[in-house]
């Protein structure tokens, strides 16, 4: 492998590790093994509580990052129906619960179909989206209100 010329690497990002920290760790390992600094970037981010494929590009392949981000993605999730948190994930405690008796497999499948294809969604305020140079989740953790625009 020629990391200076450019390689595309897929890693399984660990739970509770930021995408940046995962990238920094791989950069350190490569630079240490090769005895020189390696240019490296990631094609998209995963939230710290998410695990899964993080695509890393080295050397001249970093120029392909924007194009790689246009590819379709598929997600799987484990969730608790009838409970909400401030961050929509396990980072915060459950702050409200709702009845779930009416929820059927058919209803879940119908709702999931609404998330297929080209859709617009407002990201959660506890997300990695940048707002005036700062991550939305950092602003929220500092107690600031965040208004995010829908993304495709």
Which residues are covered by each model-predicted region?
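Catalytic/RNA-binding core of pseudouridine synthases
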Residues: 1-152
């Amino acid at each position: 492998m020629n990391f200076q010329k450019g390689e595309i690497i897929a890693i399984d990002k660990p739970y509770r590790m930021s995408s940046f920290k995962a990238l920094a760790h791989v950069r350190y390992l490569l630079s240490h093994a090769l005895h020189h600094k390696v240019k490296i970037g990631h094609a998209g981010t995963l939230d710290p509580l998410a695990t899964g494929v993080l695509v890393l590009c080295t050397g001249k392949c970093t120029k392909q990052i924007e194009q790689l981000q246009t590819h379709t993605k598929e997600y799987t999730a484990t969730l608790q129906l009838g409970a909400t948190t401030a961050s929509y994930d396990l980072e915060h405690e459950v702050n409200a619960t709702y009845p779930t008796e009416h929820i059927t497999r058919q209803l879940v499948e119908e709702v999931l179909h609404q998330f297929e294809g080209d859709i617009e969604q407002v990201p959660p305020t506890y997300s990695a989206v940048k707002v005036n140079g700062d991550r939305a989740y950092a602003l929220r953790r500092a107690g600031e209100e965040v208004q995010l625009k829908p993304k495709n």
